[in-house]
Amino acid sequence: MDDNKKRALAAALGQIERQFGKGAVMRMGDHERTGIPAISTGSLGLDIALGIGGLPKGRIVEIYGPESSGKTTLTLSVIAEAQKSGATCAFVDAEHALDPEYAGKLGVNVDDLLVSQPDTGEQALEITDMLVRSNAVDVIIVDSVAALVPKAEIEGEMGDMHVGLQARLMSQALRKITGNIKNANCLVIFINQIRMKIGVMFGSPETTTGGNALKFYASVRLDIRRTGAVKEGDEVVGSETRVKIVKNKVSPPFRQAEFQILYGKGIYRNGEIIDLGVSQGLVEKSGAWYAYQGNKIGQGKANAAKYLQENPAIGAEIEKQIREKLLKAGVVAEAGKAAAADAKADDVADADAGY
């Protein structure tokens, strides 16, 4: 750059700083670049598939899927993981369906959880914005976008037409809160439902509620599906779950993870540790026996997972090695598939070790 351009640029930068404050425009090379901080999802395979070890702070995340696919369970698991590090979490329960007892079983500290059950969509989004602007809340869950009913629709008659009201509400709210979320370094997760588009001949007829704004503003979008049942004999005790990362602005997208959700216990984390440990050569498997550093830890995956629950330090040690090996090496594609493959072969449901 020649001297005239340098002087002109310096003058422009000086004027911008005087008018808008220091830091309004910066050279990226003047500041040390750090990795994006993340909060674990509670699923080791999903954390690895996301590429940064969890969901990014300071961003908007959308989790959508059919009914009973595990959307709320996954978000409660995120809250439980965040609270372990002392984070303050809030749950905006627009569906008025949060079960504190179930949340407690998943590891959520219910006493410290902030809960709001707003009457209208405007109220829910205003509360969300105020919590973000407080700079004191680390994780906010909005459950769900479909339940953010505009005030005009609530006060109107049943059957009245309100075309595009919810989409306009979401678009306006997201324009307002996105910058605040980045400044507060707060993770905001919107749970969304699936609807069917009428008259679609080609491509998927599925779409999410609330218009297109959330699709654009979200840094990460997760499509969660129930793919099968976890059985103990004839009794169904859990769900086989697949999560596909359909959008990811912080790492390569379109990866997926598979894990199990056990009813009343949550994500079967110790099972994931065993399977990923075997796939990475950290846990030895000989026949039905599993061993770690030459010491047998159980016959069958269920018993090995139970051993990790009884010895959490060993489980944490194996998990740390898996994260370092996969995240630093960038070997993240299909990280959860190994966990799902062995899970179907073993009698996982016997384990009392839900985590």
Swiss-Prot record:
Pfam name, any one: RecA
PROSITE patterns to which the protein is assigned, alphabetical: RECA_1, RECA_2, RECA_3
GO cellular component: cytosol
InterPro entries: AAA+_ATPase, DNA_recomb/repair_RecA, DNA_recomb/repair_RecA_CS, P-loop_NTPase, RecA-like_C, RecA-like_N, RecA_ATP-bd, RecA_C_sf
Top-level taxon of the source organism: Bacteria
Gene3D superfamilies: P-loop containing nucleotide triphosphate hydrolases (3.40.50.300)
Places the protein is found: Cytoplasm
Residue numbers binding ATP: 65-72
GO molecular function: ATP binding; ATP hydrolysis activity; ATP-dependent DNA damage sensor activity; damaged DNA binding; single-stranded DNA binding
GO BP terms: DNA recombination; DNA repair; SOS response
Assigned keywords, A-Z: ATP-binding, Cytoplasm, DNA damage, DNA recombination, DNA repair, DNA-binding, Nucleotide-binding, SOS response
Statement: the UniProt record of this protein carries the keyword Transcription regulation: no
Family: Belongs to the RecA family.
Known function: Can catalyze the hydrolysis of ATP in the presence of single-stranded DNA, the ATP-dependent uptake of single-stranded DNA by duplex DNA, and the ATP-dependent hybridization of homologous single-stranded DNAs. It interacts with LexA causing its activation and leading to its autocatalytic cleavage.
UniProt cross-references to PANTHER family, sorted A to Z: MITOCHONDRIAL DNA REPAIR PROTEIN RECA HOMOLOG-RELATED, RECA
Name of this protein: Protein RecA
Species in which this protein is naturally found: Pseudomonas putida (strain W619)
